[in-house]
Amino acid sequence: MAGAAPTTAFGQAVIGPPGSGKTTYCLGMSEFLRALGRRVAVVNLDPANDGLPYECAVDVGELVGLGDVMDALRLGPNGGLLYCMEYLEANLDWLRAKLEPLRGHYFLFDCPGQVELCTHHTALRSIFSQMAQWDLRLTAVHLVDSHYCTDPAKFISVLCTSLATMLHVELPHINLLSKMDLIEHYGKLAFNLDYYTEVLDLSYLLEHLASDPFFRRYRQLNEKLVQLVEDYSLVSFIPLNIQDKDSIQRVLQAVDKANGYCFGVQEQRSLEAMMSAAMGADFHFSSTLGIQEKYLAPSEQTAEQEAMQL
C-alpha cells in the first residue's frame, strides 16, 4: 500500500574470530550511523561478551548466560557457547519479541567469535535465516585482523576461513581487514596492500612459503587451498580503521549496496548520493592506494620490492 509504513528492516551481522574488533566496530559504526541520522539498535548475540561499551538494545544474556550453562552442564567455554546459540535458536520467539518494538531501527548484531559458528555449525545460520523471514535484511560483516597479511601462511588460512564463512552463512557478505592503523606494528607486507585486499595472483604467496623449510613440506596442500580460493573467486577485503570516518563511510557504502538499504525508502538521498553508492565510489584501487599511503610509511618498501633490488 502506498501510504503504509515500511516494514522491512536492515542491519549488519558482525562476525569474525575473537580479537578481530567486532565489539569496537559495533560501537564505532553505531556512533557513525547516529551522526548520519539513522536510528540504531545494537543487539548483543554473544553471551560471553561482558562489559559492553555500547548501549545495548537487546542482550542475549537476558535469555541465557554462558557462566550458568558452563556450571550446570559442566561444559567448557566453546561447548557452552555452542549450547547457548542452540538455545537461542530454539527460543527465537524471545528474540522476535525483543526486536519487534525496534522495527524502524537499523540493527547491528554483535555475534560470538567462535569460528565454527560461521563455518559449519548451523545455529547461527538458522537464526539469520529466520530473521530474513521476519523481513530483516542483513549483510554479514566479517572482520579479520590485518596483521594476518604479514604472514603468507596465516593469510591463506584467513582466505579459506573467509570463503567457508561466505558459503555457509548465506548472507550478502563483505570482508574487512580491521585495525589498519596498527598494520605497521606487525611487520612489513610482502606486497602492496591492494594485493591483499583484491586477492591477486596467490602463486606469489606460495613462493614465499617455499622459502620456509616447514611449509615446503606442505606445498601441495597449500597449492590446493590457493586453487580453491581462486576457483571460487569470491573473497576480497575492504581495509578498515574504525577511528577514521572516511574508512567507516567506505565500509557503510559497501554494506548498504549489499543489503539494498541505499535504494530503500527509509532514508531519502539525493540523486548524486545514490549514483555514488551505485557506482561505488569504489574504484577500489584508488581508495586502497590512499589507505596504503596513509598507514604505511612512504619511505618503507615492501619485502618483495627489497628482494627485487638485491
UniProtKB/Swiss-Prot annotation:
Spell out which residues are annotated as carrying N-acetylalanine.
A2
Q: Does the keyword Ligase apply?
A: no
Q: Which residues bind GTP?
A: G19, S20, G21, K22, T23, T24, S178, K179, M180, D181
Q: Name one GO molecular function term.
A: hydrolase activity
Annotated site, Stabilizes the phosphate intermediate, chain positions: N78
Which keywords has UniProt assigned to this entry? Acetylation, GTP-binding, Hydrolase, Nucleotide-binding
As recorded in UniProt, coiled-coil segments are none
Q: Where is this motif: Gly-Pro-Asn (GPN)-loop?
A: 76-78
Q: What does this protein do?
A: Small GTPase required for proper localization of RNA polymerase II and III (RNAPII and RNAPIII). May act at an RNAP assembly step prior to nuclear import.
The subunit field of the Swiss-Prot or TrEMBL record says:
Heterodimers with GPN1 or GPN3. Binds to RNA polymerase II (RNAPII).
Record family assignment:
Belongs to the GPN-loop GTPase family.
Protein name as catalogued:
GPN-loop GTPase 2
Organism from which the protein derives? Mus musculus
User: What's the gene?
Assistant: Gpn2
